[in-house]
């Protein structure tokens, strides 16, 4: 994945790839989304967080004890670096892996502010000691900067700024 993004030298192809991703929103599944949202708010600076618990009529169909409905999440939405993500509890109790399909936080660096914002975000992540860094956020041979890390929940992330 890293090679794909850093190897794109042709600006036309890069812009075409970016446009094809418009409208795609990562939808993550967790055992405890309420807890995960708190983590993303604390460590990633997530904002505009909304969370919906299931109604009592859904409790039976999801196999949830009505006493803990307020702890469960059927839908949530939040922003990280201006990018929208969604999440819900994994009601099927199936093992899921977010490691094989990284979430890309892709920022344009035309104004320079995006590079500063991404660097501040990266520094905060690393200082938290609550992520595992696989590749530092640094300049790439094809331009821009890229960093790769995994969070507490096993979600892999790419932070990319293209000049």
PLM feature segments, named:
Residues 4-19, 50-51, 71, 79, ...:
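Vicinal oxygen chelate
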